[in-house]
């Protein structure tokens, strides 16, 4: 390497001037062991021979600092062997060192007469030794490193042009093992000057990588070796993965592995970890920076791992440090109670302040209190809560199995994740209620006191929960083989009864139920006893044979009469109990509350005063209009009677400009409702008659009418749930029937549903005008008859009875099982009447159990005496609920039917459709045209054979769409059969 360097000139042996640069800054990866230019004074290296060989010469650098060099130029003589040895150089742990030589060399061709003796190379040697005081050069001990040749040599011309050509050569030496070594330079006849000699080794310098510190590390013994080095985490940090790096032979760090993370309370800054500032925190050892304290918390010192919550705020054990501090919620709002006999429904609104947390739930505390509302104690385990008592996520709960005529205090607590850290009464709201009188619980045991040939004396204990004063007991009994088809009832005010007139040696089944002012409880389970064969002393021992003969003959005649009566009874109806039933009905009405028609009062206002409670209009707050009724608007609102909790109510208003007759008809419904008290009958809260508008106040039913509710929730309920709905409606109708009240307008639209899915019979205005009802026709008593729901005898002869209500109940069953479908679809009223007269009945809805459709058909018996009573309907539904397997069989078993089902009017006329697409468009199912085409249903003849499995297979999965398509298919199939003369109604 040659260059022009400006500096101090040195004129040497050859008349050549060098410009030499001063001290250099070397890379951090190089550690110098010897640098001839940095030595102050003479180098004092050993030369051999001492004279005539290497000669030490001083030059000045640009800073006038002397630099010692060695030169030799014995080119005129042959066989030169001039050695120059450095002082002992300590190895300092290095296994491989590097020798950097800067020198100049004279071109032999530029010297005359030296062609045979002038050389242009020299040799470099080293010798390892632990002795730093060796005085002599023993050539045989030295190991040759290399022969050094110049890249550029200078000539006489260069001297004249003041150009110096400086060469730099670097050689590595190793591996070394002893404490130190000597370097030696052998001249064999060259004209050479050693400007500088530098010996160094390489290291990987101290560094910090990934928060791990790696120390100075000497490179390996081989030029390709890598030295593995484990780092140590910097202060205030910890290992995540073991930090490692490799030191390469060139002094570079390679392949960083692993890392350290700043401890909690510290963050990375300039390769180190510094403490979080005041107001900041870091909870974990991560690579994240410190975070500002979340809301409602603070940190007063540096290096905080968490923030302290403000006064009144807390952090749950499971809350992360990044979550704001929160506080317990405020109390629930707007707690409303609704007492239903011995059950209470509670509803409330969420707390105004959730405490800043999303995990608000509710706990319920139940206390039973004395008459003065003191000495309260926990309700105990006998009370049941639905869905649960604690951890409620909803804002409503039902409490059942309470005691009648008892004061209860219910506390609803708002709870969140920090409530335990600061419980307080301000998180709860309470309400005190008094339960009503309820029907008694079931009699659990019946014991025979005396059994004879023709009688049984029974006794039983009082029900466990009488829920009031027991007014009487009712004993139902029947012969075991009659299976409750024909039964008798005996009533008594004591807990015993003598049942007489029984057949000898016959098994009888007995049931007992109790009655309070709230009504009858459930019948007990069956208890079976058999009369014995011991004859009763009816004939004295001294009776004459004639008397005995007459007695026997009379007995035989009596048996024949009873058998004949039984056969006739069976022929009349499978449900009717013939004359006995009529007698029983008269007997049942004795001592039972009976409905009073308000229209029989000379002064209709007297009926209102007697059966409805007057409410001050100031207690009522109307919130919004939810519908329009016959006489005015129907609104929702709130009722707050002094001393009681505020409740939601429905409010019917009488429009302005009414006549006296309209007012009387409007309030007559309140006079009717006020006589009823049953969980499945809409409850009248009261009336407002002393100011305008006149209002009727009833309980509020959140889910509205049953038909709309079912259509909105199509397919969402199980069969058991639907049967439960029917059972509730049937129970309410049984109550009305027992009170001798005929509803006349029983339909799903007149059944209301509350938030707990309890269905209640409403709309007791059939005896008034119904001219605004689109379902009505045929005026009766100023009103109209809803043809589709009304029994044929009521349509033809205006004969409304409980039996006609049973017919309507069968239609309601069909509405429920079809999820609110319109009975008889789009048929006209006249077509409906004609079809019923011809014996047609509605087909079973999709997936309707056979047992339920059979009950519908029983309700639609032409002879009203053949229809079941509501008590029998409720009993049958109870049996179905207790035996769910009986509800699994669906479909229509035509062999067991006496009536042919109706056509489905949703099916287009067979003659009016020419293709599958026409048919699908007619029933508004054209979206499935590609499904039918892809499956090969290209003709109507093929479509009429499709079934539910086929629809599922071709990709039609919606139950309601399957129902609609299959109903239309059934209708088309029936039309085809009619056209072919094969369908004849029975």
Curated annotation (Swiss-Prot):
Its EC number is 2.7.10.1. One of its GO terms (molecular function) is ATP binding. It comes from the Eukaryota. Residues 21-547 are extracellular. Glycans are attached at residues 340, 407. ATP binds at residues 626-634, 652. It holds the Pfam family EphA2_TM. Residues 570-986 are cytoplasmic. A motif (PDZ-binding) lies at residues 984-986. Residues 30-209 form the Eph LBD domain. PANTHER family: EPH RECEPTOR A5, EPHRIN TYPE-A RECEPTOR 4. This is Ephrin type-A receptor 4-A. It comes from Xenopus laevis.
